[in-house]
Amino acid sequence: SDLTKLKMRMDTIPVSIAIAQAANESGWGTSRFALEGNALFGQWTWSKKGISPKNKSKNQKHKILQFQILKASVKAYKNNLNTHNAYSEFREVRAQLRENDEQITGLLLTKYLKNYASIGEKYVKILEDIIEKNSLTDFDKANLLPTKLKDGVAL
């Protein structure tokens, strides 16, 4: 049903995956794309405002999508994983984990991101290594406390 599809596309992305992908794609936030365009996830564009990679071949016309603020980069990343056909299996497995009341973790789902980069399975291994070496699975279990506001300022 449409509601089932919508639920699959609105579910969470494990924090460990988001951190690992941002770290890998942006060189831990030090890449030219991150510094000049708030581009943490290396998303390509062919029509929107973007930054041209310096080492691309002449037949490659893509740019790296750039953003005014980091939050917009994260939002575009979430939208990409939650809607693009290349990640449908990622969403299906995540939905199955949710249905079975199992924990949704980065290490369980990284294998479904081989289409994110041209290096495929090697990319999955890189993400798994980043997650494991930096204990990022700890963040998959974290729950943020609600923000308390006083006069519109977070305390």
What residues fall within each predicted segment?
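Catalytic cores of secreted/periplasmic lytic hydrolases that degrade extracellular macromolecules
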Residues: 1-20, 24-155
